[in-house]
């Protein structure tokens, strides 16, 4: 794993496995990355959705090269949505 200014960058070869599933008794997707050093990182559906939105915005736009999202607590939200959301600035 490389670092730059306190940021961790995972190289593709450092991710040895990925499991995306809706655990028993839950309603939302969880995605677990397994790393070469044996550690794992589990992301909730709302985090993956934010990553997908940002990725899609950058990859499909001829002019957008960056998307910035910040976490916010949402007092009003759709049923089933998390109170904490990553939203575009």
Explain the meaning of each model-derived region.
Residues 28-30, 64, 81:
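Broad gene-expression machinery/nucleic-acid interaction feature
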Residues 70-89:
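Polar/charged, Gly/Pro-rich intrinsically disordered segments
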Residues 22-32:
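Short acidic, Gly/Pro-enriched loop/turn segments at secondary-structure junctions
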Residues 1-9:
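Short aromatic-glycine motifs in intrinsically disordered, low-complexity regions
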Residues 12-21:
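Phosphoinositide-dependent membrane-docking surfaces
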Residues 1-2, 40-41, 87:
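Short, compositionally biased strand/turn segments
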Residues 35-74:
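Acidic, aromatic-enriched beta-alpha/helix-loop junctions
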